[in-house]
Amino acid sequence: MADKKAPAAGWPVANGEYVVGNPESCVAVVTLGSHGLDQAAIDAGAAISGPCHTENLGIEKVVANYISNPNIRFMVITGSEVQGHITGQCIKALYENGIGDDGGIIGAKGAIPFMENVGTEPVGRLQSQIVECIDLIDVEDTGKISDAIKNCISKDPGAFEEEPMVIELEGGAAAAGEESTSIKPTSPEMALLEARMRIVSEKMNEAAMIAKFNSGYYNGKIQGIAIGLFLSIVIFSLL
């Protein structure tokens, strides 16, 4: 039997609409925007299963719950993709590419894919701990999902060698004896506001560039007309 470790006290550490199974299971499931899939995932042997609707705060909670349980080594992304947020693709991009210096998920296509409370260390831990990400985005067939979970369990490599990493998303204290990363919490409202301000700033810069181009274009056009009229007058005066 594969070696197992105790997850962080009170696991899952981040609250949400999760269904929790055996915490020693090596599989965690994200059901994105679908409903009614979580219990089937738990029945198939998953440690935790739940939806993820947003590409920022929602993903942060997924990361927090996964890295605080070293037994989780496989991540199954399934269920219907969340329109606009494109959360499934963002989670996959986070696992494959990580985040940039600004906290943005590299290669993510969601509206606001920024990690405000999760830094490079927790993301790196997720990338090291998870040995395989199974892409079943837009799959709602419980049979296929169950088969994927059971296949992962058959390949269980055992618990990750490091202790649980606890992220204080909401200012909670880490339990004694656990590896913790203290991150200054940001309220959901501020996180979204800052991200939207960045987007507005980018749009304003784009608009300024377009306005500058148009201004130069029209100024050049007027100058061309003036020069043409001047040359016409000169030519007619010589006739």
From Swiss-Prot:
Compartment list: Cell membrane
Pathway the protein contributes to: One-carbon metabolism; methanogenesis from CO(2); methyl-coenzyme M from 5,10-methylene-5,6,7,8-tetrahydromethanopterin: step 2/2
Classification via InterPro entries: MeTrfase_MtrA/MtxA, MtrA
Membrane topology note: Single-pass membrane protein
Cofactor note: Binds 1 5-hydroxybenzimidazolylcobamide group.
Ranges facing Extracellular side: 239
GO biological process: methanogenesis, from carbon dioxide; methylation; one-carbon metabolic process
Molecular functions (GO terms): cobalt ion binding; tetrahydromethanopterin S-methyltransferase activity
Record topological domains on the Cytoplasmic side: 1-215
Required co-factors: 5-hydroxybenzimidazolylcob(I)amide
Known role: Part of a complex that catalyzes the formation of methyl-coenzyme M and tetrahydromethanopterin from coenzyme M and methyl-tetrahydromethanopterin. This is an energy-conserving, sodium-ion translocating step.
Family: Belongs to the MtrA family.
Protein name: Tetrahydromethanopterin S-methyltransferase subunit A
Species annotation: Methanococcus maripaludis (strain DSM 14266 / JCM 13030 / NBRC 101832 / S2 / LL)
